[in-house]
Amino acid sequence: MNKRMNELVALLNRYATEYYTSDNPSVSDSEYDRLYRELVELETAYPEQVLADSPTHRVGGKVLDGFEKYSHQYPLYSLQDAFSREELDAFDARVRKEVAHPTYICELKIDGLSISLTYEKGILVAGVTRGDGSIGENITENLKRVKDIPLTLPEELDITVRGECYMPRASFDQVNQARQENGEPEFANPRNAAAGTLRQLDTAVVAKRNLATFLYQEASPSTRDSQEKGLKYLEQLGFVVNPKRILAENIDEIWNFIQEVGQERENLPYDIDGVVIKVNDLASQEELGFTVKAPKWAVAYKFPAEEKEAQLLSVDWTVGRTGVVTPTANLTPVQLAGTTVSRATLHNVDYIAEKDIRKDDTVIVYKAGDIIPAVLRVVESKRVSEEKLDIPTNCPSCNSDLLHFEDEVALRCINPRCPAQIMEGLIHFASRDAMNITGLGPSIVEKLFAANLVKDVADIYRLQEEDFLLLEGVKEKSAAKLYQAIQASKENSAEKLLFGLGIRHVGSKASQLLLQYFHSIENLYQADSEEVASIESLGGVIAKSLQTYFATEGSEILLRELKETGVNLDYKGQTVVADAALSGLTVVLTGKLERLKRSEAKSKLESLGAKVTGSVSKKTDLVVVGADAGSKLQKAQELGIQVRDEAWLESL
């Protein structure tokens, strides 16, 4: 039987690839169904012989308990957005400073969910959501039900690939029709439907909803030398790759492609929200590198957002964790980009004044970045009142006087004991990107704060299980889970804690860079601002913000209390070696290396104690050059900085 099962699995997987990937089936649906039924019968009779890549794994019945966290071996960066031709020109100018004659590749930006697929010896072992780029959720069982994702590859490869999982428009219509007939709320748009489907604990539901994918990148180190060749290789492995793409030599060609795609957009069988432009050559990508948040070699052009008219009914003012007071407009409900919008941000008081927004105005609403509803402008021809909006002079939370500093656009409450700021800070501390305390969301934090059980983040680690039972709606099982989640968070690597402290200008990526360099929060506390400012991708603003924060008596007390409660203050990832051959030296890599990949060269320099930066300055000690080094080599020579080549680096 094993031989026949092998034959059937091989045949059915080949036919599935022809149907879903190549769109060129060689057998009829009835023949496929006949072979499929034969395989099901054999697997039922001989369950111990079911193969890992059997197509029957894609259907039916497994109910999951939940989704485990999964650390990405290769981080998933976000992309810098562009909304105009001018911003694309600026991107091109930045690239050409480092790469003399770049070729770009333009691909459609699919409006779906980012996923990462990992194969070991050619077998799918992990399918993961993007999450925060470093940690996602393991949804392997659900992704196995997406019919165009290969369960096995034609080669026994260890490989990680990235792509988008989406719901085709036809599937979306079918799903919503079924939900309407069952009296269930309809999904607002295909992206929400795809997200909701991938979060299903019942894998049979996922199998029925006909999700699809486009893969676009090999995340693990690639042996291809360009993005275009990488896409063709993914196709050879059996992945679905979007065929709508071009190579372009300049922004004129890119802009023409964007206009063409914009005209075709509504006729596509899936949703897109833009075009992604990348430098095609992978060596040039390595040369350009990354900012804290995004690659310097790519940009995502976003199509203009849909706009609708709505009437302003009132304005709410809320206080954030940094004391900024933000106005939010209450509006007559409108349908916008697939969802009902009745509230939209007004940004800040300067924005209200600049746009001259008044009571009862008719305004234009759009979704900034296709996500956040915002008021764009006033329809002055429909103005019914000359009365200006009431701007608060006191904090809506603590009633302290609000300040409007000359160099800021927003009103700010500077009371350090402002309840709203404290509560928002606690919510931020427990959030996924910070300490990631599962279950400790806004609702529980608000109840803990109202019950006077927590006043600062250190209090979170003093909570006992019985404290949660004092809160309305919290039962013993939930209390136990919350307590366990808090205890588990004590072991987080320290960059999570640093970000959780909510220090102004210090985001998650900056926190990671700081801890990679200083090894612990205690070392960072002792560091001077000049050393902080010298770290690649950081700078003076972050350095000054850290200096201001650590200068307060409260910060020293808080760090001591966190340490006393058992919270880890050390970085657990790869750190900079202190007493190595290049310890303390600032090094710049430039040009194309012949034998080492740029990432390998950077890792080697860092392992020898060097700090690798992206630009040459008076602070640079050494420049390692490859072919076509360009302006960085010229600047190093002008400044009299020592220059070394790849052979020298290999000899260390």
Swiss-Prot record:
It is an enzyme of class 6 (ligase). Gene3D superfamilies: 5' to 3' exonuclease, C-terminal subdomain (1.10.150.20), 6.20.10.30, BRCT domain (3.40.50.10190), DNA ligase/mRNA capping enzyme (3.30.470.30), Helix hairpin bin (1.10.287.610), Nucleic acid-binding proteins (2.40.50.140). Disulfide bonds: none annotated. DNA ligase that catalyzes the formation of phosphodiester linkages between 5'-phosphoryl and 3'-hydroxyl groups in double-stranded DNA using NAD as a coenzyme and as the energy source for the reaction. It is essential for DNA replication and repair of damaged DNA. NAD(+) binds at residues 29-33, 78-79, 107, 130, 164, 278, 302. Belongs to the NAD-dependent DNA ligase family. LigA subfamily. Residues 577-652 form the BRCT domain. InterPro entries: BRCT_dom, BRCT_dom_sf, DisA/LigA_HHH, DNA_ligase, DNA_ligase_AS, DNA_ligase_CS, DNAligase_adenylation, DNAligase_N. PANTHER family: CHROMOSOME TRANSMISSION FIDELITY FACTOR 18, DNA LIGASE. Its cofactor is Mg(2+); Mn(2+). This is DNA ligase. PROSITE patterns: BRCT, DNA_LIGASE_N1, DNA_LIGASE_N2. GO terms for molecular function: DNA binding; DNA ligase (NAD+) activity; metal ion binding. GO terms for cellular component: cytosol. Pfam families: BRCT, DNA_ligase_aden, DNA_ligase_OB, DNA_ligase_ZBD, HHH_2, HHH_5. Zn(2+) binds at residues 395, 398, 413, 418.
